[in-house]
Amino acid sequence: MKSLSILGSTGSIGLSTLDVVRQHPDRFTITGLAEGHDVTLLAEQIREFKPSIVSVRDEASANQLRELIGESGPEIRWGIEGAAVVGEADGSDMVVSAIVGAAGLVPTVRAIKAGKDIALANKETLVVAGQLVSELVREHKVQLLPVDSEHSAIFQSLSGHRTEDIERIILTASGGPFRKTPAEELKLVKPEQALKHPQWSMGAKITIDSATLMNKGLEVIEAHWLFNMPAEKIGVVVHPQSIIHSMVEYIDGCVMAQLGAPDMRAPIAYALSWPERCESGIKKLDLTQIGTLTFEEPDMKRFPALRLAFDALREGRTYPAVLNAANEIAVAAFLNNNIGFTDIPAIVDKTMQAHEALTPVDLDEYLAVDRWARETAAALTL
């Protein structure tokens, strides 16, 4: 029996994780839950999964939750500190890190320091502080297992192979809802249009990132840290059907790929049960029904966010943290109808240009850079 704490339990990844857990009561149990937006749903999760500790956004939400579940429920914490306490709490074997954005960094780092294995859905943890997190994973001898479908695919395709035999890794991208949209029309895109992803059901922020291709850019940086690959050995190909989740090309010319229906429960189930496998509940793949798989080069002129991410990776140091923070601010401004769709990468670019890179030595320095980038980007949205 493996005990789990889920950071981000009411979000898309959290709900999919609990669905996998629900299918395997003999394999998984829940120790802790943390959420940020839906106290009512968290109360339902508490009644079903009976965690011993939970966390919510703030003290007001904690009081609301206590009214919903009564005094006999679990210990309740709040804020980033509360999520971190859930992540490091005794009794859990693995922490599913699924808080959206850089807010997931501190709780994930605290969980690693507490010796917890990590199922990582929060790519920003590695984008912002990849060097630090990688060192902590080695120091505390924990497993860092990818939940993103692309990185799970690479992880599976690398199984049994030597790192020195890798020619390159290839991340696939759906291309988003505007894959064929002319550049001049992208300026007119509204949030409700960008939130309609052609293949995946995800939260608002990652759906916008997928539309700009920033999500793929963040995944490029995440892949660098997960698999110790330089930028020149990481490729991106647009694959609209989202059936091949990513590939590894080897020095002998052979390519290993992982295929499956576009359903996050598959990579989640693999991360939770690794090195074994368990039923995920997804629809089985029938290639005869799909018929055709197509591939294209990404258009970095129409979607400059992907180019900016590669630039940040090549520059290194604190540039990826600035890229991520500026993007979070710009996406929020777009969702609030304060800026246009094409303003998102423009604001990221301007924020990066204003940055003088540092070499952080601890988490506080990464967080200081994150704050600077948010303030700088926010000023550009006014």
Curated annotation (Swiss-Prot):
Record keywords, A-Z = Isoprene biosynthesis, Manganese, Metal-binding, NADP, Oxidoreductase
Matching entries from Pfam families are given as: DXP_redisom_C (PF08436), DXP_reductoisom (PF02670), DXPR_C (PF13288)
Residues bound to NADPH are 10-13, 36, 122, 124, 203
Can you tell me which residues the record assigns to a coiled coil? Answer: none
Q: Which residues bind Mn(2+)?
A: 148, 150, 219
InterPro entries per UniProt: DXP_reductoisomerase (IPR003821), DXP_reductoisomerase_C (IPR013644), DXP_reductoisomerase_N (IPR013512), DXPR_C (IPR026877), DXPR_C_sf (IPR036169), NAD(P)-bd_dom_sf (IPR036291)
Name what cofactor the protein needs.
Answer: Mg(2+); Mn(2+)
| Pathway terms, separated by semicolons | Isoprenoid biosynthesis; isopentenyl diphosphate biosynthesis via DXP pathway; isopentenyl diphosphate from 1-deoxy-D-xylulose 5-phosphate: step 1/6
HAMAP family in the record, alphabetically? DXP_reductoisom (MF_00183)
Q: Which NCBIfam families match?
A: Dxr, PRK12464.1
List the protein's name. Answer: 1-deoxy-D-xylulose 5-phosphate reductoisomerase
Source species of the chain:
Prosthecochloris aestuarii (strain DSM 271 / SK 413)
What gene name does this entry carry?
dxr
